[in-house]
């Protein structure tokens, strides 16, 4: 069974062992589960990673609830990625998530009346969530008031994040977050 009838998720390899358990590559024709996993706290890791990307793209006010439109944009973006990189676009998505997820973050601890930043390791589930959020934010920011379509912007963001390109919004955000954490050690 192939996603969108084109790409086989079984040939995709998650190279980052930390997030392997949280990136679901279950083969589905149309990535639309109707929120079946919303009842349990951490069951979102069982939803297909392509559907989670589409759900994150629906965050802005004008796209809220327009899943078919978003899935069409994701499919077009995967076509563009496939043509540009000659790779399985799901593999590019997984590599982009692995590269865009921050490994270290900052928490604020209060000692007396003073708040002190402290660097902490990021949980794998949060790394995946944050990476998906950064990729979708970068896509929405690039497509807003632009002649480029959402699909083109998503394809550019995915390819940039998969290649660790600092022009990518997701990689830029991740580096900034890790830089702050390094300063707070």
Curated annotation (Swiss-Prot):
GO terms for cellular component: small ribosomal subunit. The keyword rRNA-binding applies. Disulfide bonds: none annotated. Keywords: Ribonucleoprotein, Ribosomal protein, RNA-binding, rRNA-binding. GO terms for molecular function: rRNA binding; structural constituent of ribosome. One of its GO terms (biological process) is translation. InterPro entries: Ribosomal_uS7, Ribosomal_uS7_arc, Ribosomal_uS7_dom, Ribosomal_uS7_dom_sf, Ribosomal_uS7_euk/arc. Part of the 30S ribosomal subunit. Belongs to the universal ribosomal protein uS7 family. PANTHER family: RIBOSOMAL PROTEIN S7. One of the primary rRNA binding proteins, it binds directly to 16S rRNA where it nucleates assembly of the head domain of the 30S subunit. Is located at the subunit interface close to the decoding center. This is Small ribosomal subunit protein uS7. It comes from Methanosarcina barkeri (strain Fusaro / DSM 804).
């Amino acid at each position: 069974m192939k996603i969108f009838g084109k790409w086989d998720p079984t040939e995709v390899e998650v190279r980052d062992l930390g997030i392997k358990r949280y990136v679901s590559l279950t083969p589905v024709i149309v990535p639309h589960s109707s929120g079946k996993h919303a009842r349990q706290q951490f069951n979102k890791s069982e939803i297909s990673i392509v559907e989670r990307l589409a759900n994150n793209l629906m965050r802005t006010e004008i796209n809220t609830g327009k899943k078919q439109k978003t899935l069409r944009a994701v499919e077009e973006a995967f076509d563009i990625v496939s043509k540009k990189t000659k790779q399985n676009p799901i593999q590019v998505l997984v590599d982009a998530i692995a590269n865009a997820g921050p490994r270290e973050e900052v928490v604020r601890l209060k000692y007396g009346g003073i708040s002190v930043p402290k660097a902490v390791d990021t949980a794998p589930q949060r790394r995946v969530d944050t990476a998906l959020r950064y990729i979708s934010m970068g896509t929405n920011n690039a497509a807003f008031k632009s002649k480029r379509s959402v699909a083109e912007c998503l394809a550019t963001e995915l390819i940039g994040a998969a290649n660790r390109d600092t022009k990518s919004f997701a990689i830029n955000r991740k580096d900034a977050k890790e830089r702050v954490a390094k300063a707070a050690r």
